[in-house]
Amino acid sequence: MPKEKYDPPDPRRIYTIMSAEEVANGKKSHWDELEISGRVRSLSTSLWTLTHLTVLHLSDNNLSRIPPDIAKLHNLVYLDLSSNKLRSLPAELGNVVSLRELLLNNNLLRVLPFELGRLFRLQTLGLKGNPLSQDILSLYQEPDGMRKLLNYMLDNLSVHPEQLPHRPWITLKERDQILPSVSFTVMCYNVLCDKYATRQLYGYCPSWALNWEYRKKGIMDEIISCDADIISLQEVETEQYFTLFMPALEERGYDGFFSPKSRAKIMSDQEKKHVDGCAIFFRTEKFSLVQKHTVEFNQIAMANSEGSEAMLNRVMTKDNIGVSVLLEVHKDFSGAGMKPHHSSEKQLLMVANAHMHWDPEYSDVKLIQTMMFVSELKSIIEKAACRPGSPTPDPNSIPFVLCADLNSLLDSGVVEYLTNGGVADNHKDFKELRYNECLTNFNCNGKNGTPDGRITHGFQLRSAYENNLMPYTNYTFDFKGVIDYIFYSKTHMDVLGILGPLDPQWMMDNNITGCPHPHIPSDHFSLLTQLELHPPLLPIINGVHLPSRR
């Protein structure tokens, strides 16, 4: 796990006492360190109410036990219990995951609770002067012994075989009983590629639960239980697409399309097996593949750099990709009422999937990658919708579903751009870097568009998970937030329902500080929505769109 900067407490423990004048002037006292000394034998229960404490000195006393309530001091980074008479430690001490230093020297400890393995942020563990068992001492005395001991305890900590509670299905709208329509389900899921699932990043997870051979079963169980008509996956390893995902889903009636990140093109066959990418699967009894496309963001950045150093040095160097499939909705699935108003036409559906750059410091890159992808999708849709002799096609003429790990929060420029149809060309997420000339290439009307200071995309999109229906889609120790999305054409579709979040009380009861976890195979939660596709619209008559009828 990346270590944040940690400054140990000052051993001198200097303090100041407020003067009468300071008290009279309303100065507030603040203290977050506490020392208790004087050969104390027991601790007051009121100590466990001081949840603001970050440092607690309890050394050189006569304490024979520490109560489980120690876990209530969830802000502790330093705990000194040295030189007491402790014979055991409460398992609950392992829940104080904020700890950086835990000093247990010179006690009577023979064993340690395996729960201490959860203290993945520890930088110092003092165990000298204890009659510990030989297996503990042997590990502890090895080079990097503290880390090896903690890993051993975490890996051997028993995990209750408790079944994951079902996530609730949230109905948002009843299906239209008057006008004919068709409904289908869409899943979006970042499965956490094996090479990214390291102890350095996920130190709170046992190594066996990070192992791909263990996680892949939970991931496939999640995909199969959702039983979606369309499945969009990110961080799919190339080899796993061909040996796991495609064969397993093909057996269940799916076809699929996959592309790895751009770096795979310059790698050996052996190396490219481990490059991750994006995949889309669709149920063949409901859809047929018409077109498939891969969008390489670094190639588009190079072609549209317009002399911008930021475009070349920041955007072009990232090898993220997006994929899309143009599908035909089967007539026997859509029903007679869903037939297009031109009998020769097909009912088409565009589905796109992308994974944007991860680094929070590169908000400009994420926003431009999103613009490039949407601009390419607009071109694909316009070509597919174009008929000889017809005027310039409307990008909203074909229903569109966008699934993505955008690595961007709800208040980001990326989400604003997708939801509102555009953003200002001086949006703060561009970080005042020189992109203006490049951005016009991705504008709705191209370089000839009105220079109104906005970059627009022309689609009319809405998020399936509006109104904070999901408090987080990515859940790690350091970060919990919404970064995964399903967008859809609001002129063509409605959301009938979505899969809700996991019970937060269950997460709390099971001390799940981050994912992956033995019960949760990825650091992301899947999204699942049911969409209702409306009949195509006939030409406008007297200013009104009339739906096609039988």
Curated annotation (Swiss-Prot):
Residues 1-148 are annotated as: Required for interaction with cnot1, cnot3 and cnot7. Its EC number is 3.1.13.4. One of its GO terms (molecular function) is poly(A)-specific ribonuclease activity. Keywords: Cytoplasm, Exonuclease, Hydrolase, Leucine-rich repeat, Magnesium, Metal-binding, mRNA processing, Nuclease, Nucleus, Repeat, RNA-mediated gene silencing, Transcription, Transcription regulation, Translation regulation. Pfam families: Exo_endo_phos, LRR_8. One of its GO terms (biological process) is mRNA processing. One of its GO terms (cellular component) is CCR4-NOT complex. SUPFAM superfamilies: DNase I-like, L domain-like. The active site is at residue 405. Substrate binds at residues 235, 271, 355, 360, 407, 474, 479. Residues 153-550 are annotated as: Nuclease domain. Its cofactor is Mg(2+). LRR repeats lie at residues 52-73, 75-96, 98-120, 121-143. The keyword Cytoplasm applies. Belongs to the CCR4/nocturin family. This is CCR4-NOT transcription complex subunit 6-like-A. It comes from Xenopus laevis (African clawed frog).
